[in-house]
Curated annotation (Swiss-Prot):
The keyword Nuclease does not apply. GTP binds at D14, H15, G16, K17, S18, T19, N131, K132, I133, D134. One of its GO terms (molecular function) is GTP binding. This is Elongation factor 4. One of its GO terms (cellular component) is plasma membrane. GO terms for biological process: positive regulation of translation. Pfam families: EFG_C, GTP_EFTU, GTP_EFTU_D2, LepA_C. The gene is lepA. It comes from Aliivibrio fischeri (strain ATCC 700601 / ES114) (Vibrio fischeri). It is a peripheral membrane protein. Residues 2-184 form the tr-type G domain. Gene3D superfamilies: 3.30.70.240, Elongation factor 4, C-terminal domain, Elongation Factor G (Translational Gtpase), domain 3, P-loop containing nucleotide triphosphate hydrolases, Translation factors. It is found in: Cell inner membrane. It is an enzyme of class 3 (hydrolase).
Length: 597
């Protein structure tokens, strides 16, 4: 057991986690040169296309150290984006140490800090590594000082390497063996295994990635899932050397996968504990704190026949992505669908793309909203995650919106731009500290603004140098209103948005103008109105198409023309009463982009 090392690789986006993982696999001979590919752990098509890691992946390697001993390294490659921070915290729970990879050109960025603090809170040994030293812009000495100054870890002897060229990777492996402690646990104690991750395989059922804390698991053992009390037999058990390899036993401290033929998606939830059915342990391991979704949006299948498939797809996906939340919802305009909760906009995009690709669905998304706390006049407090659930205006005492604490790291040249952006987003400055050339600014910004396009705007206003990390802070009273969209006097529930009173006029106007572009002309006028309660704040009209009825009159009396025009007018009026307006998919997408330009 003292030859096992469990560690995660954490870093900011694009500091070279996945490339470093590739090198470690190559040096330890996990894959032959023929099977080796760039970013071999990013197995999803979506990950390769966007060049980001979405799912944490685990690998077991054997490494023969300089002292002649063979060590078993279990490591987990983690994502860097804020939206997938839940993946990171789960991966860290399975380790004793973490490699903090820092780009020697870019230096410390916001996610570096956030992930590092998560690791330190979990009592892990954090080992700093300076990557990309082959770049002409690299300045490892300055970055080592930065790490010490901003993060507070001694980085003077930090290992320097270049994952791309393979320079210094051997030193990294030696550092891992020396600095990261061996797992603790009792091989004789009753078995306890923590489920770190699980996914659904069409042939095997639920596959779970587990970390054995005490005891061991063997093939054909009878095991019990602690939260449900169900008993299963282990069919197959093994490790990843990125390839799935079967073994007969997983010992204390190891990380591996288990297949028990569980067909029910909720059979082995992430964060649960497995133990032996007979003589098992009494206590569950402390799992992970549940994350609260920050953004909610309605997802509806385009054709209502897909509803069943959509429900199954969401179930399978939520097994793989524990931070996804969903509940059924129905809308007058869109039929049956689900209200889904996500950790951020990127997460929402990724989930939607995965549903459309992996499960072959066509989906419509409604405008994303955050959760508001609403105090009613009778003292009741509601949590509202969709504009449709907001009570009537005269029942509301106050609406409180969620405020996010944003930690922004930015070079001092771009500080002005960033402050301007934060003020425009109704932010309040909390703190500002200078660390050499970098400035750490802390703002409290309403979550609704952060979620919409804060990240993109921050990147563009600072030429990509600013980095952001945010988390939910508190609810704060604010004058929020619901803007409804009416088509010919009928409310369309799926188009409503909740916005701040100051922005409501402009948002309403933008909304109706955008909608006007997308609704095709009909035989009668279509009035598109934005309203707050009964008060109309903006209107635009899609003009009717009309036939020239007096073209056939040649000369003749004016009363003849009047008669024809009047007849046409009455016909249009009748049409307007019974006609209904078809909303194209683009009209819904238009709403997503209101307020972005």
């Amino acid at each position: 057991m003292k030859h096992i090392r469990n560690f995660s690789i954490i870093a900011h986006i694009d500091h070279g986690k996945s490339t470093l993982s590739d090198r470690l696999i190559q040096v330890c001979g996990g894959l032959s040169d023929r099977e080796m590919a760039a970013q071999v752990l990013d197995s999803m098509d979506l990950e390769r296309e966007r060049g980001i890691t979405i799912k944490a992946q685990s690998v077991t390697l054997d490494y023969t150290a300089k002292d002649g001993e063979t060590y078993q390294l279990n490591f987990i490659d983690t994502p860097g984006h804020v939206d997938f921070s839940y993946e990171v915290s789960r991966s860290l729970a399975a380790c004793e140490g973490a490699l903090l990879v820092v780009d020697a050109g870019q230096g410390v960025e916001a996610q570096t800090l956030a992930n590092c603090y998560t690791a330190i809170e979990m009592d892990l040994e954090v080992v700093p590594i300076l990557n990309k030293i082959d770049l002409p812009a690299a300045d490892p000495d300055r970055v080592a000082e930065e790490i010490e100054e901003i993060v507070g870890i001694d980085a003077t002897d930090a290992t320097r390497c270049s994952a791309k060229t393979g320079l210094g990777v051997d030193e990294v492996l030696e550092t891992i063996v020396k600095s990261i402690p061996a797992p603790e646990g009792d091989p004789e104690a009753p078995t306890q295994a923590l489920i770190i991750d699980s996914w659904f395989d069409n042939y095997l059922g639920v596959v779970s990635l587990v970390r054995i804390k005490n005891g061991s698991l063997k093939k054909n053992d009878k095991i019990k899932v602690m939260s449900t009390g169900q008993v299963w037999g282990i069919d197959r058990i093994g490790i990843f050397t990125p390839k799935q390899i079967d073994t007969d036993v997983l010992n204390t401290g190891e990380v591996g996968w288990v297949v028990c033929g569980i067909k029910d998606i909720l059979g082995a939830p992430v964060g649960d504990t497995l133990t032996h059915a007979k003589g098992g342990c009494e206590e569950r391991l402390p799992g992970f704190q549940k994350v609260k979704p920050q953004v909610y949006a309605g997802l509806f299948p385009v054709s209502s026949d897909d509803y069943e498939n959509f429900r199954d797809a969401l179930g399978k996906l939520s097994l793989n992505d524990a931070s996804l939340f969903y509940e059924p919802e129905s809308s007058a305009a869109l039929g049956f669908g689900f209200r889904c909760g996500f950790l951020g906009m990127l997460h929402m995009e990724i989930i939607q793309e995965r549903l459309e690709r992996e499960y072959d669905l066509d989906l419509i998304t409604t405008a994303p909203t955050v959760v508001y706390e609403v105090a009613k006049t009778d003292g009741e407090i509601l949590y509202v995650d969709s504009p449709a659930k907001l009570p009537a205006v005269n029942d509301i005492d106050e609406i409180r919106e969620p405020i996010a604490r944003c930690n922004i790291l930015v070079p001092s040249d771009y500080l002005g731009n960033v402050i301007t952006l934060c003020v425009e987003k109704r932010g309040v400055q909390v703190d500002m500290q200078y660390h050499g050339n970098q400035v750490a600014v802390t703002y409290d910004v309403p979550m609704a603004e952060v979620v919409l396009d804060f990240f993109d705007r921050l990147k563009s206003t600072s030429r990509g140098y600013a980095s952001l990390d945010y988390n939910f802070q508190r609810y704060e009273a604010s004058s929020m209103v619901r803007v409804d969209v009416l088509l010919n006097g009928d409310k369309v529930d799926a188009l409503a948005i909740i916005t701040h009173k100051d922005n409501s006029q402009s948002r309403g106007r933008l909304l109706v103008e955008k909608m006007k572009e997308f609704i095709p002309r009909q035989m009668f006028d279509i009035a598109i109105q934005a309203a707050i309660g009964n008060h109309i704040i903006a209107r635009s009209t899609v003009k009717q198409l009309r036939k020239n009825v007096i073209a056939k009159c040649y000369g003749g009396d004016v009363s003849r023309k009047k008669k024809l025009l009047k007849k046409q007018k009455e016909g249009k009026k009748r049409m307007k009463q019974i006609g209904n307006v078809e909303l194209p998919q683009e009209a819904f997408l238009a709403i997503l982009h209101v307020g972005k330009d």
